[in-house]
């Protein structure tokens, strides 16, 4: 079996896994699903399939979603730009955590929190900016 390339196939696997977890009494809040991010350099629909899968997981199972966000840009130039855009879309779709470069994308995450109304008076965004500026100054 190859890597799943459609949201429907992934959904089928997730339903099987979810049912198995429930049969063992594992609550949804203790489950973290990783939808396997593939590079858009090899499949232009890979990012979109992942975003659809994230939405499906949050809607149907209510579990946490983890993803290797930087996989999406593998083999492409200006990976950081692609990663930033994808991370914003993934968080909007419902991703709860990401495996990524914490220094390069931490300010992006803070900006997303700010724009989603989760950072009163931009306090965390400004603090992160200052912390990163201090690191660069060393």
Give the residues covered by each predicted segment.
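Catalytic alpha/beta core domains of metabolic enzymes, predominantly
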Residues: 1-136
């Amino acid at each position: 079996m190859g890597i799943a390339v459609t949201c429907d196939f992934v959904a089928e696997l997730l339903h099987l896994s979810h049912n198995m977890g429930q049969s063992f009494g594992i609550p949804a809040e203790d489950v973290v699903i990783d939808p396997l991010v593939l590079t858009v350099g090899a499949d232009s629909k890979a990012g979109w399939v992942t975003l659809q899968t994230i939405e499906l997981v949050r809607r149907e199972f209510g579990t946490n979603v983890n993803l290797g966000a930087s996989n999406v840009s593998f083999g492409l130039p200006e990976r950081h730009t692609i990663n930033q855009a994808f991370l914003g879309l993934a968080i909007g779709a419902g991703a709860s955590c990401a495996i990524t470069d914490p220094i390069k994308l931490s300010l992006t995450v803070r900006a997303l929190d700010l724009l989603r109304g989760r950072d009163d008076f931009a306090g965390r965004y400004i603090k992160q900016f200052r912390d990163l500026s201090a690191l660069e100054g060393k």
